Curated annotation (Swiss-Prot):
Keyword match RNA-binding: yes
InterPro entries: Ribosomal_uL4, Ribosomal_uL4-like, Ribosomal_uL4_dom_sf
Superkingdom of the source species: Bacteria
Species of origin: Aromatoleum aromaticum (strain DSM 19018 / LMG 30748 / EbN1)
Region (Disordered): 47-94
Official protein name in the record: Large ribosomal subunit protein uL4
Length: 206
């Protein structure tokens, strides 16, 4: 699979031969959906909680006698039928949202995403991607000069200047290869990969 090599102006300067195992796969929508949903489900913190009828702070005394008042029978104020009562099926922090996804499926899903990005010309390679100082303005100008707006930048190693410069740009995300995930790959309009990161991706995900 041939990928575009961009210069600092965002124009194609050459092409690179990349692994077909990573960038030449067929588009598998069902697998991509499963990988993305599983990743998001496994990232949930599981902190939502509600109270059931046994947990709300209400008296357990019977509000009125069973028969003879003409009113509907009632057992206790914590009943889900009453205002302020407990929920019937309360959410719990112990709810388990995790989904099992084996490594082979995960890698195949990521490769399918990368292949589709390459086919749609939304993925490109750069020799190097950096800024001279940790300033948002410098990175914003660099991206504007390359014609990029919503972009994921994948680097081979941590670049503090680049990372700090990107934190205030909500349409820009900078990740190392080891941090790259399927949700980020499908979220941004363009994906820029450094040559060093490309080599690491081919080594890790094939």
């Amino acid at each position: 699979m041939e990928l575009k090599l961009l210069n600092d102006q965002g124009a194609q300067s050459a092409t690179l031969q990349a692994s077909d195992a990573l960038f030449g796969r067929d588009y598998n929508e069902a697998l991509i959906h499963q990988v993305v949903v599983a990743y998001m489900a496994n990232a949930r913190s599981g902190n939502r909680a509600q109270k059931g009828r046994a947990e709300v702070s209400k008296s357990t005394r019977k509000p009125w006698r069973q028969k003879g008042t003409g009113r509907a029978r009632a057992g206790m104020a914590s009943s889900p039928l009453w205002r302020g009562g407990g929920r019937v099926f309360p959410n719990s922090p112990e709810d388990n949202f995790s989904q099992k996804l084996n490594r082979k499926m995960y890698r195949a899903g990521v490769a399918s995403i990368l292949s589709q990005l390459a086919r749609e010309d939304r993925l490109a390679i750069v020799e190097n991607f950096s800024v001279e100082a940790p300033k948002t303005r410098l990175l914003s100008q660099k991206l504007k000069g390359m014609g990029l707006d919503s972009v994921l930048v994948i680097t081979d190693e941590f670049d503090e200047n680049l990372f700090l410069s990107s934190r205030n740009l909500h349409k820009v995300l900078v990740l190392e290869v080891s941090e790259t995930d399927p949700v980020s790959l499908v979220h941004y309009d363009r994906v820029i990969v450094t040559k060093g990161a490309l080599a690491k991706m081919e080594e890790a995900w094939q």
